[in-house]
């Protein structure tokens, strides 16, 4: 049974281990105490304390989901991680990046060959992490992932707080992926030879206006819609993180994903994905 080290054993990893624990020997590494893996370690990977060399003692795959620190332009946590392991023991590393590295493309179709133009410091740290992975000497796959939703990961607080939504006719597009679909893609990527040393966009393949996404949630909950506002009002109302999302838009081209993994997406219909997430 192949060993898989889950670095940043958080939300998405719960779906990975729930479905694939009979197929892989999972080692979970994160700050909190968890029991979803065969081997679980409560370790802060941002500390270069030598313990990672003891934990990653057997050849295996790495799925790296640990976020960068909250400031600066370089992912210092990844720097420490790569220095703290025996690279020869890593068969392949799957790095979970973000579609935010593309910046604002004003609803244009974006494939993996496009030049990245990260606008926020958060996205610049992710771009730096991609560079580190590509130059690590380890076989890799970089997945550029958009908004992740799923059970326990719907914006229900914003819905219950009735946060105003941007008018549908002017709202820009967003890209989403269900956590179950993402976990499946991650695992299939581990051993697929066509994914060696590539960058791949992943999403459900059905771009949607952000407001429509929220309205589908309101519909599923049988709730009355909130107030609709324009972008000028939104930039006065929303917090800084929310504003960075609404002011960037693109349509992810997932042709490569569909070529390598045809029919891998179960929740192409966002309404079905929301229904499952609320179940």
Residue ranges and their predicted role:
Residues 13-14:
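N-terminal Rossmann-fold NAD(P) dinucleotide-binding loop
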Residues 57-95, 128:
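NAD(P)-cofactor binding segment of oxidoreductase domains
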Residues 82-119:
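Conserved Rossmann-fold NAD(P)-dependent oxidoreductase catalytic core, especially the SDR/UDP-sugar
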Residues 106-142:
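Catalytic helix-loop patch of NAD(P)-dependent Rossmann-fold dehydrogenases
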Residues 134-174:
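NAD(P)-dependent short-chain dehydrogenase/reductase
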Residues 154-158, 167-191, 198:
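Substrate-positioning beta->alpha
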Residues 192-241:
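Mid/C-terminal beta-alpha module of Rossmann-like enzyme folds, strongest
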Residues 224, 244-279:
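C-terminal amphipathic/interface module of NAD(P)-dependent oxidoreductases
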């Amino acid at each position: 049974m192949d060993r898989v080290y889950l670095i940043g054993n958080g939300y998405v990893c719960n779906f990975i281990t729930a479905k694939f624990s009979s197929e892989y020997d999972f080692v979970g590494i994160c700050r909190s105490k968890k029991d979803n893996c065969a081997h679980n370690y409560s370790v802060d990977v941002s500390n270069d304390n030598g313990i990672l060399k003891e934990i990653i003692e057997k050849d295996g795959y790495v799925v790296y989901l640990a976020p960068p620190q909250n400031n600066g332009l370089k992912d210092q946590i990844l720097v420490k991680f790569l220095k703290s392991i025996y690279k020869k023991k890593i068969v392949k590393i799957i790095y979970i990046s973000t579609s935010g590295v593309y910046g604002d493309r004003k609803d244009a179709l974006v494939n993996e060959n496009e030049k990245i133009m990260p606008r926020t410091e958060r996205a610049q740290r992710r771009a730096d992490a991609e560079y580190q992975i590509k130059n690590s000497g380890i076989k890799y796959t970089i997945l550029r992932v958009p908004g992740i939703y799923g059970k326990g990961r719907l914006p229900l607080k914003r819905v219950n707080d009735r946060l105003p939504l941007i008018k549908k006719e002017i709202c820009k597009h967003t890209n989403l992926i269900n956590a179950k679909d993402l976990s499946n893609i991650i695992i299939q990527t581990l051993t697929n030879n066509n994914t060696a040393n590539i960058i791949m966009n992943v999403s459900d393949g059905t771009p949607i206006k952000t407001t429509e996404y929220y309205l589908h949630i309101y519909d599923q909950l049988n709730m009355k819609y909130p107030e609709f506002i324009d972008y000028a009002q939104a930039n006065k109302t929303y917090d800084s993180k929310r504003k960075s999302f609404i002011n960037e838009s693109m349509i992810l081209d997932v042709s490569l994903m569909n070529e390598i993994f045809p029919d891998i997406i179960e929740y192409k219909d966002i309404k079905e994905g929301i229904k499952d997430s609320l179940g």
